[in-house]
Amino acid sequence: MDTEMDGVNNDGYTSLYKETAKGNIKKVVELLYKGVNPNTPNVDSYTPLHIAAKTGNIKIIRRLIRYGANVDKETNDGYTALLIAICTGDIKTCNVLLDEGANPNYVNKYGITPLVRIISYYRPTILKLLMDRGANCNQIINIGQVTYTIMEYFINLFDEYKIPILNLVPYIIISKFKASITVNIEGFNRNIAAIAKNSRLLEVALKCKSEIAFMTTRGIGDKSLFEICILEDIKDIDHNSFVAFLDKLIESQSNLRIYGYTMNKIIEMGRYRKELLCSAVRVNSCNLSSLNTEWCLLPLKGKLNILSKLNNDNIKKLILNDAIKVNNKTG
C-alpha cells in the first residue's frame, strides 16, 4: 500500500476523503481495495464517512463501512455520520447508517444523542425512523457528574423547540407499555416529571392517555387496537379480519389524531389483501394444486370462501397464472 495515499496530503485532506467528496465511487473502491484506511481523518478530524453522510452518497457509505469505516466515529466537534445526516435532514442516509450499525442511542462527548439532535433541528420523519429502529426516549445521559433525560435537557428550552418537543411526548407515553421499560423506568419517571411541569406538555400527555383508552375499547376479535397497534401483537389474527373490519379500522383511525399512525400497517394490510381478493375472483381459471374445483361455475361467495383460505402469495400466483394464460391466448 502507498502510505502517502493513506495519509493526509499537504492540503490537509486524505486522497480517500477527496474522492469521496467528489462522489467518485470507482476511485473510492480502488483506494479501499489497495488497503487505504477509511478511518484516517483529515486535519479537521473529519473522515470519508462523514463527508459521504453529508453528501448522502449511499453507495460510497456502504463501501466505506464494508471496508472497515467506524460508523460511530466522532469528529473533534462531536459529529458522527448519523448526527450529520440528521442535521441535513436526509432520512435515506439515516436509514442506511442504521442498517449498517449506527447506534441510535450513541452519546457523544458533549452529551448529544441522535434524539437530541432531531429535536434541535426539528426532523419529525427522522424521529419516527429512529424510534422504530430502537432509539430510547427514556435514556439517561451521563456527562461527568451530570445526568439528564431528553425532557430534562429541553424543558427550559420549550419556547424555542416547542413543536419537536411536543412530538416526542407520545413516544414517551407509549414507552411505558414496551418490554424495555423494565430497564428504563427511572428515565421514564424523570421524563414524566418534566412533562408534568409544563402545561402544554401535560395537555398532550393527557390526550395520549385518552387515545390509548379509546384504543382499548376497539379491536378485532378478542384483541384491542391497543394490543394490535401499540404492542404490535398481530401474530394470531387472521388477515381476512383486516379486510372484514377495514371500514371500522379506518373509522377508528379518524378518531386518533396522535396515535392514528400506529394503525397504518394493519389498514394497509387490509387494503392490500382486499385488492388481491377482488382481482382473484375475476380470474377465469384456478389451477392451484391445493384446489380442485370448476372455478368459473362457483358463485362469488364460494370463490371468496376458497380464496380466504389462501395466503397472499398463493393468491398472487393464481392471478399471475391466469394473466399468463390470457396473454398466451391473445398472442
From Swiss-Prot:
It holds the Pfam family Ank_2. PROSITE patterns: ANK_REP_REGION (PS50297), ANK_REPEAT (PS50088). It comes from the Viruses. Keywords: ANK repeat, Repeat. ANK repeats lie at residues 11-40, 44-73, 77-106, 110-139. PANTHER family: ANKYRIN REPEAT AND EF-HAND DOMAIN-CONTAINING PROTEIN 1 (PTHR24127:SF1). This is Putative ankyrin repeat protein FPV012.
